[in-house]
A protein has these predicted regions:
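Residue-level signal for inorganic ion chemistry
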Residues: 41, 127, 158, 216
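General small-molecule cofactor/ligand-binding pocket signal
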Residues: 26, 77, 103-105, 196-199
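Mobile active-site "lid"/loop adjacent to the S-adenosyl-L-methionine
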Residues: 128-157
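Conserved Class I SAM-dependent methyltransferase catalytic core
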Residues: 152-203, 207-209
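Conserved SAM/SAH cofactor-binding pocket of Class I
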Residues: 44-137
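A generic structural signal for alpha->beta connector loops
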Residues: 22, 50, 73, 99-101, ...
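SAM/dcSAM-binding transferase cores
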Residues: 208-249
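Class I SAM-dependent transferase core
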Residues: 6-49
Length: 249
């Protein structure tokens, strides 16, 4: 942690190593810490030299920070509606000296295109809430509920705003749950974001998939490539080699 900018890290927060470029991230275990889905999305998304990328619902900024480490993108923006999470993301950006490459913005996904403008990004990424509406909510709309359930925005909001902000031929990357694939594809096509690439994620080789990684192309032609399955665990507690590589271990 040498040569890091001095930023405030509160007593309820922690610093987690990201194993990429010596980067670290500030998180609050009492709120919502990033999971494997965000890391896998950062390994699936492609940001080319000179491209600008936007992460919708960035949380503590994990996806922009990892994409900055892994790609040659020109600039990365993270949009987050919860001020506390956005503040942690901004401090992580400063801690890693990434202020010139990453911008964190506090705001609502439903108003994103009005804020950033039409055709303003070549790439949009998102790790959105998976659960529909109020289904399964046991408590008030706290940080964890907002991250997991479509309380403040839904899939339609994300795709509508993404379609406006993507340049023609721009790429949309999302991690979601397989049980919603029919709805996802239907809404993507409705907003002229053509599904182009998909990879199912399996916890074990003999289990059903529990995540799906999707790439869409703004204004693309109809042709979907289904990539080989991504298996997470070789055995309980032991990742497959590809997972270790994605994490940077």
């Amino acid at each position: 942690m040498e040569n890091k900018t001095e930023v405030t890290i509160h007593s309820h927060e922690r610093l987690d190593e990201l194993h990429r470029n010596g980067y670290w991230i500030i998180q609050d275990p009492g709120r919502f810490c990033f999971g494997m889905d965000a890391v896998l999305l950062s390994g699936f998304a492609k940001v080319k030299p000179g491209e600008r990328a936007l992460d919708l619902g960035t949380g503590t900024g994990i996806i922009p920070i990892l994409l900055e480490a892994k790609t040659k993108g020109e600039h990365f923006t993270g949009l987050e509606i919860q001020p506390e999470s956005a503040d942690m993301a901004s401090r992580s950006v400063a801690y890693n000296h990434l202020e010139e490459k990453i911008t964190i913005v506090t705001g609502d996904i439903k108003e994103a295109s009005a804020r950033f403008g039409a055709g303003s990004f070549e790439v949009i990424t998102t790790n959105p809430p998976y659960m529909i509406g109020q289904h399964g909510i046991q408590n008030d709309a706290n940080a964890k509920t907002i991250a997991r359930h479509e309380v403040l925005c839904d899939l339609d909001d994300i795709l509508r705003e993404s379609a406006k902000m993507l340049k023609q031929g721009g790429r949309f990357y999302m991690v979601h749950r397989p049980f919603r694939l029919a709805e996802i594809f239907s809404k993507m096509v409705a907003y002229h974001i053509e599904p182009k690439r998909m990879r199912l994620v399996y916890p074990f080789v003999n289990k059903e998939p529990n995540m799906v990684l999707i790439e869409g192309l703004r204004g693309g032609k109809s042709r979907l490539t289904v990539e080989k399955p991504l298996i997470v665990y070789k055995e309980p507690g032991v990742y497959m080699p590809e997972i270790y590589d994605i994490y940077g271990y």
